[in-house]
């Protein structure tokens, strides 16, 4: 059943356009989760490097009195990443995501837009903060997998997330594949959301100035 669902997921068309500057513009339509579904695009390296731009459409507010689930405000929306350990991404994957904070929560202040990480391991997901960002800015990102760690390099900062090598014991039956923009969490997009992504050659310089260990 999982194999059938994967084929359906990877063979339909996508809501994306490519422009002369090399950026692909992915659109998540209002009331949808996905920016589209995609032909299988294999990862042929241990890393991907890309540039990404979020604009004001990445800002949303589920904390109004009319929202029955204001906690959904802090769900991690997905931008880009890849599956891992030869498994479906719901079993094992790593992704860059984002959240908009419409009210203060922990270290996050109302009105802040943040990059966040999202990891699936053993079918369970977990995520956390990376860095505060600004709309309409270009960020260069590398996501790399090492034996026991995932590494996010965002401009001049490096962040480390644990990677459970024990997942190698799982049946490895498929290549790693790219994961594309998706809104949610539980909520669907409250309005049209556009995300610009440009694939780059994998960055092997590893020149980050700041390294932070996450989970």
Language-model regions, residue ranges each:
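Sec-dependent signal peptide recognition
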Residues: 1-7
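C-terminal motif of bacterial Sec signal peptides marking the signal peptidase cleavage site
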Residues: 12-14
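Activation corresponds to long, low-complexity, non-globular regions
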Residues: 17-28, 208-215
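Secretory/extracellular carbohydrate-interaction modules
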Residues: 21-114
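Surface-exposed coil/turn segments at beta-strand junctions on protein surfaces, enriched
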Residues: 43, 132-136, 145, 172, ...
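Short tryptophan-centered beta-strand motifs in secreted/extracellular beta-sheet-rich domains
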Residues: 50, 137-145, 150-154
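Short, aromatic/His-centered strand-loop micro-motif at the edge of beta-sheets
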Residues: 114-140
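Flexible glycan-contacting loops in extracellular carbohydrate-active proteins
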Residues: 164-199, 203
């Amino acid at each position: 059943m999982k194999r059938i669902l994967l084929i359906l997921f990877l063979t339909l068309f996508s809501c994306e356009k490519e422009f002369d500057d090399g950026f692909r513009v992915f659109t998540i339509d209002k009331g949808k989760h996905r920016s589209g579904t995609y032909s299988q695009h294999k990862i042929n390296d241990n890393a991907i490097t890309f540039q990404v731009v979020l604009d004001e459409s990445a800002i949303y507010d589920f904390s109004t009195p009319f929202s029955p689930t204001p906690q959904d405000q802090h769900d991690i929306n997905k931008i880009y990443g890849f599956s891992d350990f030869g498994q479906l991404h719901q079993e094992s994957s790593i992704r860059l995501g984002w959240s908009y904070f419409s009210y203060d929560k922990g270290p996050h202040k109302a009105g802040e837009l943040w990059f966040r990480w999202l990891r699936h391991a053993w079918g369970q997901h977990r995520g956390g903060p990376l860095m505060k960002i600004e709309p309409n800015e270009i960020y260069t990102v590398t996501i790399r997998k090492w034996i026991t760690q995932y590494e996010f390099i965002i401009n001049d900062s490096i962040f480390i997330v644990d990677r459970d090598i024990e997942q190698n014991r799982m049946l490895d039956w498929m290549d790693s594949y790219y994961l594309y923009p998706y809104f949610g969490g539980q909520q669907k997009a409250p309005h049209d959301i556009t995300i610009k992504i440009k694939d780059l050659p994998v960055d092997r310089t590893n020149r980050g100035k700041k390294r932070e260990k996450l989970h």
